Amino acid sequence: MGLWDWAVAAYGAPGVSDACLALQDNHEQNVPLLLWSAWAAATGRRPDEETLEAACDTARAWDGVVLTPLRAMRRILKAPVPDIDDGPRETIRNRVKALELEAERHLLQALEALAPDPSAPPRPAIDGLAATARIWAAVTPRPALIRLADALPA
């Protein structure tokens, strides 16, 4: 199964979206990057440190230029705005949300292209999540990563 299909299925599992959003909002983690890490672990892929750094660089570029601005706009448009009718505001918000999802899909495609071929048995998701989170940020939010790993489907 490709990364996009795996990520959509995983994100829909109970508890995964909440765990992902907590990592994003409370620990400034990149959800597509985390899902890539968990997918790599689940499919027996072992990205080396250089690949992890390249994945983080790719995610940072998408995050800074595309995802964060789209997410900010979507969140601004969530609440009613004086002098803007709710219908058009919601229409624009839904379009921004669709663009954000499309951008995440493009990021996942770029990350999948960086992943090495499967070379080993699957390993626990927490191993891949922690390895990537260590490169992504100065602080590794281990309890939140464990929560995500525990929620991911086996």
Language-model segment annotations:
Residues 77-151:
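A charged, amphipathic interaction segment
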Residues 28-32, 40-45, 63, 100-104, ...:
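Short alpha-helix boundary/capping elements
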